[in-house]
UniProtKB/Swiss-Prot annotation:
Reported function: With SBE2, is involved in cell wall integrity and polarity processes like bud growth.
Alphabetized UniProt keyword annotations: Cell wall biogenesis/degradation, Cytoplasm, Golgi apparatus, Protein transport, Transport
Region (Disordered): 1-66, 107-240, 331-359
Entry GO CC: Golgi apparatus
Protein name: Protein SBE22
Gene Ontology terms: biological process: fungal-type cell wall organization; protein transport
C-alpha cells in the first residue's frame, strides 16, 4: 500500500495527455500488472522501491550524493511498493546471453541512432497497448504521474527535453503546463533521478540523464505539446534505452554509454563481458597459430622432423631404426636431458665442463640399465686437471666414445629384437598376418605394447578389451580349447585304435580263409568282424565265392551262363539301336548323374550290360550299379570274375523270394519298420508299397560312395552266408535239379538285412528327399548318403558311424 502524502497531497483528478496521433493516454501505470513480465527486463538504476533500497547494489552506494531530504521525502511518499510476483506467469530473464553474444566487443556499450529509433518505435507500440487501461486504476496512475510531473517541473527556466533525434516524443515545461499537478510530479521525479546520475558521474563534465526502468510510465507515452523557445535535445543514449522494451537489448544493459560515462556493472554483466573478451582473445590466438602453422607447412625440414646438425653435433643420438628398441627413461626425463645438453654446450667455461660431465654421467647411468649397451668397449677418458686436455676436447672425445659404444650396441640390440619379433610373428592374430600380406603393416615392427592391446578374439579395428575382460575371455577360451583338445585327443585315440583294429581284422580275414571260411565258427567270426572292417580287396572275390556257393560252385556252373558262352552268343546276336540307347540312358541316369559319376565309368560297363540283357535273367534292378563298382574295384582281376560275381550276388542275395519277403515284411503293421515309422506323422505319406519296395531300395545305393558301397555288399553277402563245411553240397544230388529246388535247400533268404538298411536311412539320413521313390529324381549330383565327402574330411569315420547304426537296427529283427 502507498503511504499518505503529507506535502504534495492527492490529485483530485488525473489529466489526460494527448499524443501526436490524437489518442488520449491516461492511467499511465494502470497496465502495470499486465506488462509486469516485460517491464522487469529494464534496469532501474536510479529508482528505489518501497523501503528506500535500490533495485541494484550500485544504486544504494550513491544515495548519499543526492539531496537527502528531497530524495527520502519523494521515495517515502511517492513511490508505491513493488508489485507482487505472479508465480503462475512466465518470467523472462532480465538480461539474456543473446544480448552479449549477438553484440561485437567493439559495440557492446555503444548506442547508435538505430537503437534510439527502435526504442522509440517500441515505446510507441507499448503506449498504444497500455492506453486502454487508463480508467481502470486511477489511483496507481495518479501516483506515478505525480512522480513524473515532479521531476519534469523541477527543471527551471521552462526547459524542454526532446527524446531522440527523430522522435516525436517531447517533454516540455511551460508556465501553462506547470500548473498541472501531474506534470509537476513528473518533473520532480526526473530531477531527482538526474541528481543521482550527476553524483555517480561526478568527474564527468556532461551530466548524464537517468536510466529509468520499465516501472516508469514515461517510456510508454507520447507527448505533443506546444514548442517552447528554449529547447534542449537529450542525447540519444539517455532515453533511448529507456524506450527500448526488449529483454535482449544491448542498450538495456548500459544506457549511458553514448555520453562517455562509466557506470558500474553488475556482477552478471562483468562475468559476461569477461567471457566475451576471453572468447575473442582465444579466437585471435587460434588464428595466429593457424597462420603460423600454415606458413610452416611448406618447410620440408619441419615436416620430416629434421633438426639442424649444428645444434647437436656433439650429442650422442640413436639411429631412427633402433630408437624403439631401447629401454630408455620416460619422455620427460629424455626431454630434460636433451635440453640441458644443448644449454650446456652453449655455456662456456669451467661450469660448462662440470655440467657436461654430470650430463654425460647421467646419460651413461640411464643407458647402462640396458643390457645390450657394452661400456667395456669404451676407452679410458682423460682426467681433467691431470691430463693436458681442454674441457672442450674432453667433452668431444667423451661424446665420440659414447656414440661409438652406442652404435655398436644398438646394432646388436636391433638384430636381437628383430630376431625375437620374427620368431613371435607366427603368434600374431590372423588379422595382422592378412594386413601384412596386403602391405598394411610389417609384422616385424609390431611391438610388445601393441601385442598387449590386441586380442585373438576381437578384430583389430575395434577398441582393445579391458584387461579384466581380456583375462576372463582368455580363461574361457583356454577352457574351451582344452575341452576341444581333449575331444580331439579322444578322436585321435579312437582313430588310432580303429586303424590298429582294421589291421588286426584284416589279418583275421587271412586267418579265416586259411582255416576255411565256410566253417561255422569262422562264419561267426566273419559276421562279427564285418561290422567293424570291410573285407580286404585281395580276399573279397574268394570270400564271396566261398560263403555263397562253397567250393562246389554249383550256382555258377549250372544256373548261370558262363562268360565265354554269353560272348559267343553276343557275337551271333546283334542288339538293336533301341536296346543300346536304353542301356546308355540307364548308365547316365543311375551312375553318371548320381554319386557313381565321381568315379570313372569303365569302358566295359556297356559290354557287360549288353551281355546281361541277352542272358536268361536279363537286366535286373541294381545290375548297372553292381557291374560299375565291381569293375572299378581292385578285388576282381578280369571280366569273367565280375560277370560271375554279379550273377551270384543277384541269385543268392537279391533273388525273387528275398524281394517278395522284403516287399511284404517292410509294410507289416506289427513289424519293426512300422513300430518306428508309424509313431511319426511325417512318415504317413511314404509308408506304402509305392515308396517302400525292393526297387526303390536300390535308389539308396545310387547315392553312396564306392567304399561304402563295397562295404554294404560285404555285409549283405556275409549275412547270406552258410556253413558249407558242416553241410557240404553234393554235386550229384543237385546236378539234375532246377534252380528253385537248389534255392530252397542251399540259399539263405535274409531280407532283414535289407529292411534294416532302409530303416537306418529313413530314420537317420532322411534329408534332401521326400521318400525313397523321389530320391531317384534328385538332380544334385553331389547329394550323397550318409554325407557328402566334401563336407567332411574323415569319411571313413562317417562310414563307420553309418554301419554302426545299421547294425543297431539289424539287431531289432
Amino acid at each position: 500500500m502507498i503511504r499518505p502524502r503529507s506535502n504534495l497531497g492527492t490529485l483530485p483528478e488525473e489529466p489526460s495527455v494527448e499524443s501526436k496521433s490524437g489518442r488520449t493516454l491516461a492511467g499511465i501505470t494502470s497496465s502495470r500488472k499486465e506488462s509486469g513480465m516485460r517491464s522487469r527486463t529494464s534496469s532501474g538504476s536510479a529508482q528505489a522501491v518501497g523501503l528506500g533500497l535500490g533495485r541494484r547494489p550500485s544504486d544504494n552506494l550513491f544515495h548519499g550524493h543526492a539531496d537527502p531530504l528531497d530524495t527520502m521525502q519523494m521515495l517515502s511518499e511517492a513511490l508505491p511498493q513493488p508489485p507482487k510476483i505472479e508465480h503462475g506467469m512466465r518470467r523472462e530473464r532480465p538480461i539474456s546471453n543473446d544480448s552479449i553474444m549477438t553484440t561485437k566487443s567493439s559495440e557492446i556499450f555503444s548506442t547508435s541512432s538505430s537503437d534510439t529509433q527502435s526504442n522509440i518505435s517500441v515505446a510507441t507500440n507499448d503506449s498504444e497497448d497500455h492506453s486502454f487501461g487508463m480508467d481502470k486504476s486511477v489511483d496507481n496512475s495518479s501516483t506515478n504521474a505525480t512522480l513524473t510531473n515532479r521531476s519534469i517541473e523541477n527543471r527551471s527556466n521552462g526547459d524542454s527535453y526532446s527524446i531522440g533525434e527523430k522522435s516525436d516524443v517531447s517533454v516540455n515545461r511551460s508556465t501553462k503546463s506547470g500548473n498541472n499537478p501531474l506534470q509537476r510530479t513528473q518533473s520532480e521525479t526526473i530531477s531527482v533521478n538526474m541528481s543521482h546520475n550527476r553524483s555517480m558521474n561526478g568527474a564527468m563534465k556532461q551530466p548524464t540523464p537517468p536510466f529509468m526502468g520499465k516501472n516508469s510510465s514515461i517510456p510508454n507515452l507520447r507527448y505533443n505539446s506546444q514548442p517552447q523557445q528554449d529547447n534542449r535535445s537529450v542525447p540519444n543514449g539517455e532515453f533511448g534505452s529507456k524506450l527500448y522494451n526488449l529483454s535482449n537489448s544491448t542498450s538495456a544493459i548500459i544506457p549511458n554509454a553514448g555520453t562517455g560515462s562509466k557506470l558500474a556493472l553488475t556482477p552478471s554483466q562483468r562475468y559476461r563481458l569477461r567471457k566475451e573478451q576471453s572468447e575473442h582473445a582465444l579466437r585471435d590466438v587460434i588464428k595466429r597459430k593457424e597462420k603460423l602453422y600454415d606458413e610452416q607447412d611448406g618447410i620440408i625440414e619441419l615436416q620430416e622432423g629434421d633438426i639442424d646438425g649444428s645444434f647437436i653435433f656433439n650429442v650422442p643420438m640413436s639411429s631412427y631404426s633402433t630408437t624403439s628398441f631401447l629401454n630408455t627413461t620416460r619422455q620427460k626425463d629424455s626431454a630434460t636431458n636433451s635440453s640441458s645438453t644443448i644449454t650446456e654446450r652453449i655455456t662456456p667455461g669451467e661450469n660448462q665442463s662440470q655440467n657436461n660431465r654430470e650430463s654425460n654421467m647421467s646419460f651413461a647411468s640411464t643407458i647402462s640399465s640396458t643390457s645390450m649397451l657394452d661400456f667395456f668397449e669404451m676407452p679410458t677418458s682423460p682426467i681433467p686437471g691431470v691430463n693436458k686436455v681442454s674441457d672442450f676436447q674432453y667433452l668431444q672425445d667423451t661424446t665420440k666414445h659414447l656414440s661409438s659404444v652406442y652404435l655398436h650396441s644398438s646394432t646388436k640390440l636391433s638384430k636381437s629384437k628383430l630376431s625375437e619379433r620374427t620368431a613371435s610373428a607366427d603368434c600374431l592374430p590372423l588379422e595382422f598376418k592378412e594386413a601384412s600380406e596386403k602391405g598394411m603393416e610389417d609384422l616385424l615392427l609390431v611391438s610388445e605394447n601393441k601385442l598387449d592391446a590386441v586380442s585373438h578374439t576381437r578384430p583389430s579395428w575395434l577398441p582393445p578389451k579391458d584387461p579384466e575382460e581380456k583375462k576372463l575371455h582368455e580363461r574361457e577360451i583356454s577352457k574351451t580349447l582344452s575341452m576341444a583338445s581333449l575331444d580331439q585327443l579322444e578322436k585321435n585315440k579312437d582313430r588310432d585304435s580303429k586303424i590298429i583294429k582294421d589291421e588286426t581284422n584284416k589279418q583275421k580275414y587271412v586267418l579265416l580263409v586259411d582255416r576255411n571260411i565256410t566253417r561255422k565258427s569262422s562264419l561267426q567270426s566273419l559276421k562279427k568282424i564285418i561290422w567293424e572292417t570291410p573285407i580286404n580287396a585281395e580276399l573279397r572275390n574268394h570270400i564271396y565265392d566261398m560263403v555263397l556257393q562253397s567250393e562246389a560252385r554249383l550256382v555258377t556252373e549250372r544256373f548261370t551262363e558262363s562268360f565265354d558262352d554269353i560272348i559267343k552268343l553276343s557275337n551271333r546276336i546283334e542288339l538293336t539301336k533301341t536296346k543300346e540307347i536304353e542301356i546308355r540312358n540307364l548308365i547316365t541316369a543311375n551312375i553318371e548323374n548320381k554319386a557313381g559319376g565321381k568315379y570313372d565309368v569303365s569302358d566295359d560297363l556297356v559290354l557287360m550290360l549288353k551281355l546281361k540283357s541277352i542272358s536268361q535273367q536279363g537286366i535286373l534292378p541294381g545290375d548297372e550299379l553292381l557291374f560299375h563298382h565291381l569293375l572299378i574295384d581292385d578285388s576282381f582281376e578280369n571280366l569273367n570274375q565280375v560277370w560271375e560275381m554279379v550273377n551270384l550276388i543277384q541269385m543268392t542275395c537279391f533273388n525273387e523270394i528275398t524281394k517278395d519277403k522284403f516287399d511284404s515284411k517292410i509294410l507289416e503293421k506289427s513289424g519293426v519298420v512300422a513300430s518306428y515309422m508309424l509313431q511319426d506323422d511325417s512318415f504317413k505319406h511314404e509308408f506304402n508299397a509305392n515308396c517302400l519296395n525292393s526297387n526303390t531300395w536300390w535308389n539308396i545305393l545310387e547315392r553312396v560312395n564306392h567304399d561304402l558301397f563295397m562295404w554294404i555288399i560285404d555285409i549283405i553277402v556275409t549275412m547270406n552266408s552258410q556253413p558249407f563245411k558242416n553241410s557240404p553240397i553234393n554235386k550229384e544230388k543237385y546236378s539234375e535239379v532246377n534252380w528253385d529246388v537248389y534255392r530252397d535247400n542251399k540259399v539263405l533268404i535274409n531280407y532283414q538285412i535289407l529292411i534294416s538298411f532302409a530303416l537306418n536311412v529313413l530314420l537317420n539320413y532322411h534329408f534332401g528327399f521326400n521318400d525313397l521313390k523321389s530320391l531317384a529324381d534328385v538332380k544334385d549330383k553331389n547329394f550323397c548318403i550318409p554325407i557328402s565327402e566334401e563336407n567332411y574330411l574323415d569319411i571313413d569315420e562317417i562310414n563307420s558311424l553309418f554301419v554302426g547304426k545299421w547294425k543297431h537296427y539289424f539287431k531289432k529283427f
